């Protein structure tokens, strides 16, 4: 933050034309014997209380030194070439004004943000009448750390006991201990190159070097896997037993809208901002679109609870060194489900079912979660037994982070972590109970007494983002390989579920007939018709993790059978119809998509 102090005999201002979409009310004003504080908010500045108190203390001290009877906080963008985004600058200036007002006994005024303004100033001209300052957020780090210490952690067990994390016995709870080490004691865990990155290359999950850092591209194999998970996310949402509406919307929103701007401030510099005729942000989840849509619905208490799901292309400006393929991205796809409930009591009841489904789905991968519950202190005091019940349902301790004296739009924010093959906790699924955004966006319903109410909203990603769910799948494969097992993708998620390999050209027609039969049953099947040896074709299919490799030669053709090599299993003969039935049973309850590649391998260009 850069500041210019002018001790003025008199100072007045008059707003003229708007300069920004984000702006205050156009109020004129004047002051005499004033310390005028011209403020440029820079990138990296934040509305942190400790930082603003440090700035305000200097402002007030300077006013006292020069004998000013009033202070004017004046937003002024011309002291820096590295300005913060308008929504951040407006908030910082507004909060600085409030902090100065609380510290100074005289008159404190603020000129409006977001306008071209005419002003008149008569500087007193004494040695201290013109001063400049540069303030950096890190100068307030001691006070900031003191504020952070107000957050504290407890371990809550299924029997309702509460423990200091430093004194808890973690015997037999290695994954939970890893979570506590990371979250409470801030210790870096694991190291080395994760094995799953090797797997991603074969399926076409890659960085896009011609885009921004943290943006991916998806080859055909990766694309079908992504879309299958998107389809499955909707199926899982419907399994909650409440009405679910699937929608689609835009990814850009105007910062001039109060609801958008106030919600966006929570993300600060992590936002993607698009400079156009108006300032736009790229959404970081589906919240904006779903809330903007539902505010226009006429909702009765009889409709509640219900959910909205969108596969939201989401954008978060992660630091370049933090991006990790498939796990931490700047652009990703979020199957974001928002559940609208009558009140906090109903929201908590719905989360019991939600919690069950979240654990059910990770269990299908042979994994489980360790959980971090972020709660406001008031919620913890008032609903501790609810958290104990969730711990009972998990059957193991949970880590609770308690945030005293702080106001959030949520009262509970739960993070569900797997522990990866390197021993690191990795957040996948989540849910939170939101008590603030319905009012912020104007979402209302009419209750039994014909009174207008604001619903309580549950935010959840049951599977996590599409990419993080797939990360969990591939990390499971890495754990399998580490244990000496053959990695095998779930058949429903395998880009190619069966590959038919003819022993010779003479068997190609029969191979195609087998492929036709399997494809008619909704099975993704391709045919290796290349001029390669049988052993190489089989090796290539195994390298591609095809779960069912079918070999057909003259003998199989004469018998009307196929020879099946099952990944991680044995080899056997079967009728093509029998194999189709087996695969159909295996993928029952999961979505189907066709093959996203040419059936014949000879028609596919090779990839580097």
From Swiss-Prot:
<dbReference type="GO" id="GO:0000049">
    <property type="term" value="F:tRNA binding"/>
</dbReference>
<comment type="similarity">
    <text>Belongs to the class-II aminoacyl-tRNA synthetase family.</text>
</comment>
<keyword id="KW-0963">Cytoplasm</keyword>
<dbReference type="InterPro" id="IPR004154">
    <property type="entry name" value="Anticodon-bd"/>
</dbReference>
<keyword id="KW-0067">ATP-binding</keyword>
<feature type="region of interest" description="Catalytic">
    <location>
        <begin position="194"/>
        <end position="490"/>
    </location>
</feature>
<protein>
    <recommendedName>
        <fullName>Threonine--tRNA ligase</fullName>
        <ecNumber>6.1.1.3</ecNumber>
    </recommendedName>
</protein>
<comment type="subunit">
    <text>Homodimer.</text>
</comment>
<dbReference type="InterPro" id="IPR002314">
    <property type="entry name" value="aa-tRNA-synt_IIb"/>
</dbReference>
<keyword id="KW-0436">Ligase</keyword>
<dbReference type="InterPro" id="IPR036621">
    <property type="entry name" value="Anticodon-bd_dom_sf"/>
</dbReference>
<feature type="binding site">
    <location>
        <position position="338"/>
    </location>
    <ligand>
        <name>Zn(2+)</name>
    </ligand>
</feature>
<dbReference type="GO" id="GO:0008270">
    <property type="term" value="F:zinc ion binding"/>
</dbReference>
<keyword id="KW-0862">Zinc</keyword>
<dbReference type="InterPro" id="IPR023509">
    <property type="entry name" value="DTD-like_sf"/>
</dbReference>
<keyword id="KW-0820">tRNA-binding</keyword>
<dbReference type="GO" id="GO:0005524">
    <property type="term" value="F:ATP binding"/>
</dbReference>
<dbReference type="GO" id="GO:0005737">
    <property type="term" value="C:cytoplasm"/>
</dbReference>
<keyword id="KW-0547">Nucleotide-binding</keyword>
<dbReference type="InterPro" id="IPR047246">
    <property type="entry name" value="ThrRS_anticodon"/>
</dbReference>
<keyword id="KW-0648">Protein biosynthesis</keyword>
<feature type="region of interest" description="Editing domain">
    <location>
        <begin position="1"/>
        <end position="143"/>
    </location>
</feature>
<comment type="function">
    <text>Catalyzes the attachment of threonine to tRNA(Thr) in a two-step reaction: L-threonine is first activated by ATP to form Thr-AMP and then transferred to the acceptor end of tRNA(Thr). Also edits incorrectly charged L-seryl-tRNA(Thr).</text>
</comment>
<dbReference type="Pfam" id="PF03129">
    <property type="entry name" value="HGTP_anticodon"/>
</dbReference>
<dbReference type="InterPro" id="IPR015011">
    <property type="entry name" value="Threonyl-tRNA_syn_edit_dom_arc"/>
</dbReference>
<dbReference type="InterPro" id="IPR002320">
    <property type="entry name" value="Thr-tRNA-ligase_IIa"/>
</dbReference>
<dbReference type="Pfam" id="PF08915">
    <property type="entry name" value="tRNA-Thr_ED"/>
</dbReference>
<feature type="binding site">
    <location>
        <position position="459"/>
    </location>
    <ligand>
        <name>Zn(2+)</name>
    </ligand>
</feature>
<dbReference type="InterPro" id="IPR045864">
    <property type="entry name" value="aa-tRNA-synth_II/BPL/LPL"/>
</dbReference>
<keyword id="KW-0694">RNA-binding</keyword>
<dbReference type="InterPro" id="IPR006195">
    <property type="entry name" value="aa-tRNA-synth_II"/>
</dbReference>
<keyword id="KW-0030">Aminoacyl-tRNA synthetase</keyword>
<dbReference type="Pfam" id="PF00587">
    <property type="entry name" value="tRNA-synt_2b"/>
</dbReference>
<dbReference type="GO" id="GO:0004829">
    <property type="term" value="F:threonine-tRNA ligase activity"/>
</dbReference>
<dbReference type="GO" id="GO:0006435">
    <property type="term" value="P:threonyl-tRNA aminoacylation"/>
</dbReference>
<feature type="region of interest" description="Catalytic">
    <location>
        <begin position="195"/>
        <end position="490"/>
    </location>
</feature>
<feature type="binding site">
    <location>
        <position position="287"/>
    </location>
    <ligand>
        <name>Zn(2+)</name>
    </ligand>
</feature>
<keyword id="KW-0479">Metal-binding</keyword>
């Amino acid at each position: 933050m850069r500041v210019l102090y002018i001790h003025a005999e008199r100072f007045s201002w008059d707003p003229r034309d708007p300069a920004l979409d984000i702006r205050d009310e156009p109020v004129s004003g004047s002051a005499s014997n004033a310390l005028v504080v011209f403020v440029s908010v820079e990138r990296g500045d934040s509305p942190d209380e400790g930082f603003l108190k440090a700035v305000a203390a200097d402002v007030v001290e300077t006013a006292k030194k020069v004998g000013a009877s009033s202070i004017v906080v004046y937003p002024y963008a011309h002291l820096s070439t590295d300005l913060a985004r308008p929504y951040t600058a407006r908030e910082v200036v507004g909060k600085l004004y409030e902090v100065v007002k609380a510290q100074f006994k005289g008159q404190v005024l603020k000129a409006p943000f977001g306008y071209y303004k005419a002003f008149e100033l008569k500087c007193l001209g004494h040695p201290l009448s013109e001063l400049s300052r540069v303030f950096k957020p890190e100068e307030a780090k001691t006070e900031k750390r003191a504020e952070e210490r107000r957050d504290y952690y407890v371990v809550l067990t299924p029997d309702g006991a509460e423990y200091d994390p430093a004194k808890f016995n973690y015997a037999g709870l290695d994954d939970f201990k890893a979570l506590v080490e990371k979250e409470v004691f801030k210790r870096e865990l694991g190291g080395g190159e994760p094995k799953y990155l090797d797997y991603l290359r074969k399926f076409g999950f890659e960085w896009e070097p011609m885009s921004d850092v943290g943006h991916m591209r998806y080859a055909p194999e990766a694309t079908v896997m992504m879309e299958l998970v998107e389809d499955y996310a909707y199926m899982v949402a419907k399994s909650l037993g409440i009405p679910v509406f699937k929608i689609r919307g835009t990814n850009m929103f105007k910062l001039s809208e109060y609801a958008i701007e106030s919600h966006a401030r929570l993300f600060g510099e992590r936002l993607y901002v698009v400079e156009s005729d108006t300032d736009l942000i790229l959404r970081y989840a589906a919240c904006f679109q779903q809330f903007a849509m539902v505010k226009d619905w006429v909702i009765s208490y009889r409709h509640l609870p219900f959910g909205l799901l969108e596969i939201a292309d989401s954008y978060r400006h992660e630091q370049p060194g933090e991006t990790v393929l498939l796990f931490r991205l700047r652009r990703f796809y979020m199957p974001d489900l928002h559940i609208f409930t009558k009140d906090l009591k109903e929201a908590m009841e719905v989360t019991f079912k939600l919690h069950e489904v979240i654990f059910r789905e990770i269990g299908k991968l042979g994994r489980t979660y360790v959980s971090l519950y972020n709660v406001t202190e008031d919620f913890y005091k008032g609903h501790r037994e609810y958290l104990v019940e969730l711990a009972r349902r998990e059957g193991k301790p949970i880590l609770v982070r308690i945030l005293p004296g702080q106001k959030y739009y949520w009262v509970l924010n739960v993070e569900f972590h797997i522990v990866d093959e390197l021993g690191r906790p990795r957040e996948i699924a989540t849910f939170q109970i939101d008590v603030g955004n319905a009012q912020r966006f104007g979402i209302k319903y009419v209750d039994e007494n014909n009174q207008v109410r604001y619903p309580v909203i549950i935010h959840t990603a049951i599977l996590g983002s599409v990419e993080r769910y797939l990360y969990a799948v591939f990390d499971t494969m890495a754990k399998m390989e580490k244990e000496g097992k053959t990695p095998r993708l779930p058949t429903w998620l395998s880009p190619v579920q069966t590959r038919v390999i003819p022993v010779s050209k003479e068997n190609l027609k029969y191979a195609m007939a087998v492929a036709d039969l399997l494809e008619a049953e909704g099975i993704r099947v391709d045919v290796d018709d290349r001029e390669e040896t049988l052993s190489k074709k089989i090796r290539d299919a195994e390298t591609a993790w095809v779960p069912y490799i079918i070999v057909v030669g003259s003998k199989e053709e004469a018998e009307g059978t196929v020879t099946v090599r099952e990944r991680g299993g044995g080899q056997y003969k079967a009728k093509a119809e029998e194999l189709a039935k087996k695969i159909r049973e295996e993928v029952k309850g999961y979505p189907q998509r066709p093959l996203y590649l040419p059936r014949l391998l000879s028609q596919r260009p090779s990839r580097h």
